[in-house]
From Swiss-Prot:
The gene is hemA. Catalyzes the NADPH-dependent reduction of glutamyl-tRNA(Glu) to glutamate 1-semialdehyde (GSA). This is Glutamyl-tRNA reductase. NCBIfam families: hemA (TIGR01035). Pathway: Porphyrin-containing compound metabolism; protoporphyrin-IX biosynthesis; 5-aminolevulinate from L-glutamyl-tRNA(Glu): step 1/2. During catalysis, the active site Cys acts as a nucleophile attacking the alpha-carbonyl group of tRNA-bound glutamate with the formation of a thioester intermediate between enzyme and glutamate, and the concomitant release of tRNA(Glu). The thioester intermediate is finally reduced by direct hydride transfer from NADPH, to form the product GSA. Its EC number is 1.2.1.70. HAMAP family: Glu_tRNA_reductase. Possesses an unusual extended V-shaped dimeric structure with each monomer consisting of three distinct domains arranged along a curved 'spinal' alpha-helix. The N-terminal catalytic domain specifically recognizes the glutamate moiety of the substrate. The second domain is the NADPH-binding domain, and the third C-terminal domain is responsible for dimerization.
Amino acid sequence: MHFIAISINHRTADVALREQVAFRDDALRLAHEDLFETKSILENVILSTCNRTEVYAIVDQIHTGRYYIQRFLARSFGFDVDDIKNMSEVKVGDEAVEHLLRVTSGLDSIVLGETQILGQMRDAFFLAQDIQTTGTIFNHLFKQAITFAKKAHNETDIADNAVSVSYAAVELAKKVFGKLKGKQTIIIGAGEMSELSLLNLLGSGIDDITVVNRTETNAYKLATKHGVNYNTLESLPTLLTNADIVISSTSSPDFIVTKSMIESVNLKRKASSLLLIDIAVPRDIEPNVNISENIFSYDVDDLKGLVDANLRERQMAADFIASQIPDEVQAHNDWVNMLGVVPVIRALREKAMTIQSETMDSIDRKLPDLSDRERTIISKHTKSIINQMLKDPIKQAKELSNDKRSNEKLELFQNIFDIDAADPYEDIKAHKAQKEKEVSIRHIFSFE
């Protein structure tokens, strides 16, 4: 058994390619089933998001498994196998386990430490579980990865620091006002940065938002898309009278918010605070508009300093999380190695107890006059002899779990005791072998 991960992500393929190799939500169930029916695949989980499509699989042979996964992806999206090879990266064994842990923790994301991927990985695993394409190893490993990621986020707060200018603007507003719910907010501009700011504001609990723009149609489109208010740029001085927060991001060559405008508006305002955040280049808000102690003004350089500091903090948190991953990989390996020992020990115990049972049957035939008490004593002592005899072999078998040649030595162990440990994938392998046989027969008798 081997663990293999094949990943198409932001490092291996540009966005145009990634868009072509993403499974739709309604196609994922069938994709899991199709892959599970593929030769060499014993367990599989498929993760497909806007930034990555990944196949995690337990395979019986590395080279065969890798080829059939790549062929599956090629067939699913209409590419050649070589195309899939060129746009993907392959991880095997410990590297695959490490990759899964990094992805689930957000260390492999475009935005370092983001938490959305954790939910996406959890959903992918639950879907695979529901379809029954996971087994003993993945049921344990994916739970381990999800638990590790949750713990990492809780212990480091890696996702708490803003690392985009638009998000930093909202975080700055939280620092000034505390809770943002109920704050009247103006967004100047209707472009991408304005929309990102709008989304972050909505996510923070603000619902009293007005979009203003020189072109009223654009303000209308953005506002109606997200269920907020809109107005013309000419209405800005009036709106400023009651506003708490202003975020500006236009492409205007001239100042939109001037010092004279703020001086005029401030005469009509109560003593409440006004936060002006300028994320435009060139600047939309004239410098030195903070004419009183209750007016706060920040530009993109101020926010960039906050973002840079937060990025450094995120990187430190990411480094700490990454330092924990080798221990997690080792813990998984220890568990897998012990997993191989358990069926061997079980088979040894079953053989020993079969011998004991047959011995008791023989005693019953030869000594039919034994009382129940005598029979119980004999049975108890024969079991005790067996347990004493098995004590050292079982101890040795358990120690093999940490041996680099554990598979080879466990096979020798089974030969010595003439036992055959059950293969947990025996039924799956038999099903695939039968399917291949049927395909071969159809091919032989095909006249096409």
